A protein has these predicted regions:
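Nucleotide and nucleotide-moiety/phosphate-recognizing core
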Residues: 3, 19, 26-31, 64-79, ...
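Short glycine/serine/threonine/alanine-rich loop segments
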Residues: 29, 44, 144
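A glycine- and Lys/Arg-enriched "phosphate-lid" helix/loop adjacent to the NTP-binding pocket
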Residues: 96-137
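Conserved glycine(s) of the Walker
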Residues: 15
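NTP-dependent small-molecule kinase module
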Residues: 2-3, 18, 22, 26, ...
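ATP-dependent small-molecule kinase phosphotransfer cores
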Residues: 36-91, 133
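Hydrophobic anchor at the beta1->P-loop junction of P-loop NTPases
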Residues: 8
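P-loop (Walker A) phosphate-binding loop of NTP-binding proteins
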Residues: 11
């Protein structure tokens, strides 16, 4: 592949973290959840950062992108859903990695996600639909590959693994 980093992008609740973790186990790659990484470097929770402002959180997220995109070991990273809001974040990963869009229909996300636990979704399902409408085109523009996650979890994991193997 010549590129060490695989970035998973998509809506909150689309399965990025679960798919990324399981795919990394199958491939022997390292795994990072970008939101957890942001919490480590900021010594704050995502919720606390958002309570200051979304831009404040996004600044830490951009720092995380710069650091994680330059990793030398084979790594899968699950991003936050809004990582695509700053093109510079995506540009970091285009240089040293591939970007896979985990595309899951909103109706499927709503079946599984606790909206109260997600800072940007606390206003309910209408907010999720609005985010989807705002971001969907960007996910498609920025991704190198797309995996539809509306079948079984194992199907989505296997698709991600297959894409990564093809790029090695």
């Amino acid at each position: 592949m010549g590129k060490n980093v695989v970035l998973l992008i998509g809506m909150p609740g689309c399965g990025k973290t679960t798919i990324g973790l399981e795919a990394s186990k199958k491939l022997g790659y390292d795994f990072y959840d970008m939101d957890r990484f942001v919490e480590e470097i900021s010594n704050s929770t995502v919720k606390e950062l958002f309570s200051i402002s979304e831009d404040y959180f996004r600044d830490y997220e951009s720092r995380a992108c710069r650091e994680l995109s330059s990793l030398k070991k084979k790594t899968i990273i699950s991003s936050g859903g809004g990582v695509i809001k700053r093109k510079a974040n995506i540009d970091c990963f285009k240089e040293n990695g591939i970007i896979i869009f985990i595309d899951r229909p909103v109706e499927e996300i709503l079946k599984d996600v606790d909206l109260d636990s997600r800072p940007l979704l606390k206003d309910g399902k209408d907010r999720l639909y609005n985010l989807y409408n705002e971001r969907y085109e960007l996910y498609n523009i920025y991704c190198d590959y797309k995996v539809i996650n509306k079948y079984t979890l194992e199907y989505a994991i296997d698709k991600v693994v297959d894409i990564i193997k093809t790029c090695e």
